[in-house]
Amino acid sequence: MDELSFAKYHGTGNDFVMIEDLGDQVALNPSLIAAVCHRGFGVGADGLIRVTKSAEADFFMDYHNADGSTAEMCGNGIRCLGKLVYERGLTHETELDVETRAGIKHLSLHTRGDEVETVTVDMGAPAFEKASIPMMGPAWEKFLQQPLEIEGVTFKASAVSMGNPHLVLVVEGEPVAVDVQRLGPQLEKHQLFPERTNVEFVVPDGDALAVRVWERGIGETMACGTGACAVVVAASEAGISARRADVRFHGGTLDVDWRSDGRVFLTGPAVRVFEGRLDPASMGERLES
């Protein structure tokens, strides 16, 4: 494969390798994606986003986790996509529809001059039924504020789908005290979740929610957009948060608004870090050696 042009973006520290491929010429595979996202041998990122054309919307977001697996949706990543297509002149519209594997999402770009500073995404309505998450158990049953034991510790846990699965756990004390590296992998691969799950550890912090997140197929990340939405939904259902709240991650703060019509809106920044070219063959050789 020839050299690939790419750009590095992040949304509240959640970083992505972005590849513009409107001609549908770039062939990706899990091993190449993992090599590109490898922080020692590749560019380094939480995920890779290929921007392509869509027959149903303005663009399609082909999103992959850092391990090469395919994911349905990424709230931070889709904001970065909005910034990329606008600032590269691929669109002159500030209202966009982007197709994802979790459906079409509407973006509102908030600009200053020629630059996109923040993006609001209509993330759609959350789903609670186990069949929608997916989660083991009766298809119609919900899992909200239920006890979940791991390593002898019982958490109050809720399962929510924002187009991808999330397990939200309310914890006591400071977020820094949570052993995310130990608990995250076990919960991601818990037998209750046949397709694995993202995991959020939540501490109420005044009018805000402090969160650490373990992402499926990635590990602990600086932030998670769909996770922020799942956290506000779960915390609101538990009576420990308003339906609109700031969600604080290591990488920054996201605004989440769960409106009365059931839809969740996510607002946050998108930042272009740098652009470059990479040699897939050379990266693969270093990774295998």
Where are these regions (language model features)?
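Active-site glycine-rich loop that binds ribose-phosphate moieties when present
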Residues: 127-156
